[in-house]
């Protein structure tokens, strides 16, 4: 029977059949993985790990987290990964379509730059939503942000001009950023201490999967001058998924404990390390000062400087960025074992050099 592990149900049966000179032992596993939506992906790796479990003292295979998850943690992380797909999709939409929208509206690079800068104002909405999370609950605001972001994405599909598109996407981007932050909070509160970077890696990969959806269907922009609108309309497919998250995702236990302690005045005041917060905020500011224009103007660069069509951009991005999955998987595992700081320094340093090189070299 199951004592601990990421299973809804688990049973191991050993049958021994005696023969003349020896015996035959048959080991059977019957289990159901507590990983909504992702259990199909985990079936064969888990099957192989259990099959080889007798050959090693530990079942902690290379793809598994450093700490063993229980069923509740596994379910929570799985559902948060689905939410991460949504935020990845919402966050990538304007960057992939801005150049095509500008073409329809007869706008130049300057107007496109203003559009992309205006979208960043949505961070004010993010601050407001996340500030409420400590009083209203993480789950409630996560669902609100998911619905709000997808609704505004669909609304962007019928934007009559570039400025209305910028307005709707400003709020949509604010919701998308709120989703990312709330997912991170809920994941950190649900995760064992030694597996937080691992879970952050899973969420990053899931968000990358969501960001890849606009890339996969970018060829629609080649169909017609207004074809880019179909990418925004695609957000409608996420509404059933959000409803499913609502039915299966529980509120953070840490938030529930916080509310109970607050009611009975038993909560201890925790000290915020201001210097560390300011340092991390400064690092994030400088990083996005470089990353944002490099990513937001990438498609414009590929169209104007490399003469790429929408379909060719899709092929290029899928070919160039898919191998990043390996890097994220390795970095998240190493971060839990060796520390976050050295991994971040190496990744940011090498990534910056390669990004600059990609825009500086003429290609082949």
Describe the residue ranges of each PLM region:
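Extracytoplasmic gate region of multi-pass secondary transporters
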Residues: 94-99, 275-328
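Hydrophobic core of transmembrane alpha-helices in multi-pass small-molecule transporters
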Residues: 85, 152, 164-178, 364
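Glycine-rich segments within core transmembrane alpha-helices of 12-TM secondary carriers
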Residues: 195-222, 238
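Structural signature of the two symmetry-related core transmembrane helices
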Residues: 140-155, 342-357
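Central cavity-lining transmembrane alpha-helices of secondary-active solute carriers
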Residues: 116-131, 184, 318-331
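Cytoplasmic helix-loop-helix junction between adjacent transmembrane helices
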Residues: 168-205
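Helix-loop junctions at membrane interfaces in 12-TM secondary transporters
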Residues: 157-168, 224-226, 359-364
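Helix-breaking motifs and short loop linkers at transmembrane-helix boundaries and internal kinks
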Residues: 106, 137, 158-163, 192, ...
């Amino acid at each position: 029977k199951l004592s601990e592990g990421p299973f809804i149900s688990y049973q191991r049966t050993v049958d021994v059949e005696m023969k003349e000179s020896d015996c035959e032992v048959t080991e059977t596993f019957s289990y159901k993985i507590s990983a909504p939506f992702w259990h199909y992906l985990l079936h064969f790796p888990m099957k192989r790990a259990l099959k080889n479990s007798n050959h090693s003292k530990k079942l902690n295979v290379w793809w598994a987290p450093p700490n063993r998850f229980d069923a509740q943690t596994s379910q929570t992380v799985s559902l948060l990964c689905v939410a991460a797909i949504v935020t990845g999709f919402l966050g990538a939409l304007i960057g992939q379509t801005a150049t095509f929208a500008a073409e329809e509206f007869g706008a130049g690079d300057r107007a496109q730059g203003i559009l992309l800068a205006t979208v960043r104002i949505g961070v004010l909405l993010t601050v407001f939503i996340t500030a409420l999370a400590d009083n209203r609950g993480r789950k409630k605001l996560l669902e609100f942000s998911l619905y709000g972001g997808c609704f505004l994405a669909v609304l962007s599909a019928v934007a009559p001009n570039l400025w209305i598109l910028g307005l709707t996407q400003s709020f949509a981007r604010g919701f998308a950023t709120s989703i990312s932050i709330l997912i991170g909070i809920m994941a950190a509160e649900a995760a064992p201490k030694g597996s937080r970077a691992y879970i952050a890696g899973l969420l990053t990969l899931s968000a990358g999967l969501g960001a890849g959806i606009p890339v996969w269907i970018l060829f629609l922009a080649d169909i017609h001058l207004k074809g880019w609108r179909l990418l925004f309309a695609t957000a409608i497919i996420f509404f059933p998924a959000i409803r499913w998250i609502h039915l299966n995702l529980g509120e953070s236990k840490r938030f529930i404990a916080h509310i109970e302690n607050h009611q009975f005045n038993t909560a201890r005041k925790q000290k915020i390390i201001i210097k560390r917060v300011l340092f991390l905020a400064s690092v994030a500011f400088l990083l996005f000062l470089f990353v944002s224009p490099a990513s937001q103007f990438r498609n414009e660069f590929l169209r104007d400087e490399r003469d790429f069509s929408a379909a060719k951009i899709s092929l290029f991005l899928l070919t160039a960025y898919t191998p990043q999955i390996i890097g994220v998987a390795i970095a998240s595992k190493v971060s839990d074992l060796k520390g976050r700081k050295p991994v971040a320094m190496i990744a940011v340093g090498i990534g910056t050099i390669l990004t600059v090189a990609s825009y500086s070299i003429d290609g082949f």
